[in-house]
């Protein structure tokens, strides 16, 4: 019997068949943005529905030299109580499913927790190189298996330097991400439709969209024109 995910309208909880794996390697996701000045309005909208938790992290985007490239995100809590933590989230992001009928992005996603005092050396040993890094500060809201994360993005003017004089805000808007994680062989369409329904409740404050970001990320550079 195939693994099946049933997402109910009330609690949005997964009901998995007996032989399903608890390890979640699929992700349905939507993206949006909201002006920072309007974030309190979004939080008030979410307050009656969601349980919140603080999130403040530094993220590094890496890729391999393989074709197609392997994309990894390294994330850790940043300067918690004046200490930099050595626990990292290592997140692999695959190429999204080419399903035009699905109302959300569906992609392979594998997350692991790693403890390392020199994570970048480990990443380099995997054949990864850093594309860019940024610092996020925001809140994570959850209800059942739905997660909403809103965060502001900050970059450092000098790599490896994170004092206040070296940090610069990237935008006057906050990034909003809403997602559901699923087992690998689960049918994703019911969860995707449920996620779309919840996302519509956030309008008109924020319009959550199925962004075709991968068309740029995974595109092959065009060969230079001959003269």
Swiss-Prot record:
One of its GO terms (molecular function) is transcription coregulator activity. One of its GO terms (cellular component) is core mediator complex. One of its GO terms (biological process) is positive regulation of transcription initiation by RNA polymerase II. The keyword RNA-binding does not apply. Its main location: nucleus. InterPro entries: Mediator_Med18. Keywords: Activator, Nucleus, Transcription, Transcription regulation. It is found in: Nucleus. Pfam families: Med18. Belongs to the Mediator complex subunit 18 family. Component of the Mediator complex, a coactivator involved in the regulated transcription of nearly all RNA polymerase II-dependent genes. Mediator functions as a bridge to convey information from gene-specific regulatory proteins to the basal RNA polymerase II transcription machinery. Mediator is recruited to promoters by direct interactions with regulatory proteins and serves as a scaffold for the assembly of a functional preinitiation complex with RNA polymerase II and the general transcription factors. Component of the Mediator complex. This is Mediator of RNA polymerase II transcription subunit 18.
């Amino acid at each position: 019997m195939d693994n099946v995910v049933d997402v109910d309208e009330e609690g949005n909880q997964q009901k998995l068949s007996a032989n399903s794996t608890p390890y979640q390697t699929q992700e349905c996701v939507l993206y949006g943005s909201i002006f920072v000045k309007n974030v309190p309005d979004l939080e008030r909208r979410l307050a009656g529905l969601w349980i919140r938790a603080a999130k403040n992290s530094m993220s590094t985007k890496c890729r391999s030299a393989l074709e197609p490239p392997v994309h990894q995100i390294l994330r850790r809590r940043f300067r918690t109580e004046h200490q930099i933590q050595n626990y990292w989230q290592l997140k692999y992001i695959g190429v999204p499913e080419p399903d035009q009928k699905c109302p959300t992005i569906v992609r392979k996603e594998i997350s692991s927790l790693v403890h390392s005092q020199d994570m970048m050396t480990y990443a380099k040993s995997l054949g990864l190189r850093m594309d860019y890094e940024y610092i996020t500060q925001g809140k994570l809201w959850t209800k059942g298996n739905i997660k909403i994360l809103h965060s502001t993005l900050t970059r450092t003017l000098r790599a490896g330097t994170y004092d206040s004089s070296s940090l610069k805000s990237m935008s006057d808007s906050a990034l909003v991400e809403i997602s559901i994680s699923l087992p690998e062989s689960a049918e994703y369409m019911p969860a995707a439709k449920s996620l779309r329904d919840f996302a519509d409740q956030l309008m008109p404050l924020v319009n959550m969209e199925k962004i075709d970001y991968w068309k740029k990320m995974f595109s092959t550079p065009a060969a230079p024109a001959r003269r």
